[in-house]
From Swiss-Prot:
GO terms for biological process: embryo development ending in birth or egg hatching; embryonic body morphogenesis; regulation of syncytium formation by plasma membrane fusion; transmembrane transport. The keyword Zinc does not apply. Residues 22-32 are cytoplasmic. Disruption phenotype: RNAi-mediated knockdown causes hyperfusion of epidermal cells in embryos. This is V-type proton ATPase subunit e. Subunit of the V0 complex of vacuolar(H+)-ATPase (V-ATPase), a multisubunit enzyme composed of a peripheral complex (V1) that hydrolyzes ATP and a membrane integral complex (V0) that translocates protons. V-ATPase is responsible for acidifying and maintaining the pH of intracellular compartments and in some cell types, is targeted to the plasma membrane, where it is responsible for acidifying the extracellular environment. During embryonic development, the V-ATPase is required to repress fusion of epidermal cells probably by negatively regulating eff-1-mediated cell fusion. Keywords: Cell membrane, Hydrogen ion transport, Ion transport, Membrane, Transmembrane, Transmembrane helix, Transport. V-ATPase is a heteromultimeric enzyme made up of two complexes: the ATP-hydrolytic V1 complex and the proton translocation V0 complex. The V1 complex consists of three catalytic AB heterodimers that form a heterohexamer, three peripheral stalks each consisting of EG heterodimers, one central rotor including subunits D and F, and the regulatory subunits C and H. The proton translocation complex V0 consists of the proton transport subunit a, a ring of proteolipid subunits c9c'', rotary subunit d, subunits e and f, and the accessory subunits vah-19/Ac45 and vah-20/PRR. The chain crosses the membrane at residues 1-21, 33-53. GO terms for molecular function: proton-transporting ATPase activity, rotational mechanism. GO terms for cellular component: apical junction complex; apical plasma membrane; plasma membrane proton-transporting V-type ATPase complex; proton-transporting V-type ATPase, V0 domain.
Length: 86
């Protein structure tokens, strides 16, 4: 359920821009180009957002910290006996 609200709301926003944006372009010699630019902008922005959003849901590689670094951090933060002995 937590993924559904941002997915639908952001997708709806870019769909409104992509479908509604070309209708507000005034008539002129470059109307077709401007309409295409609006549609392509909406598609590219949505694709960039959806790729970043979906890749954050299930990352392939998690953060990796050296054991030496973990011990140094635990010593500096004052939790050394609990972390090092486990």
């Amino acid at each position: 359920m937590g993924i559904l609200i941002p997915l639908v709301s952001v997708s709806a926003f870019w769909a409104i821009i992509g479908f509604g944006g070309p209708w507000i372009v005034p008539k002129g010699p470059n109307r077709g180009i401007i309409q295409l630019m609006i549609i392509m902008t909406a598609v590219c922005c949505w694709m960039f957002w959806i790729m970043v959003f979906l890749h954050q849901l299930n990352p392939l590689i998690g953060p990796q910290i050296n054991v030496k670094t973990i011990r140094w951090i635990s010593e500096k933060w004052g939790d050394a006996p609990n972390v090092i002995n486990n």
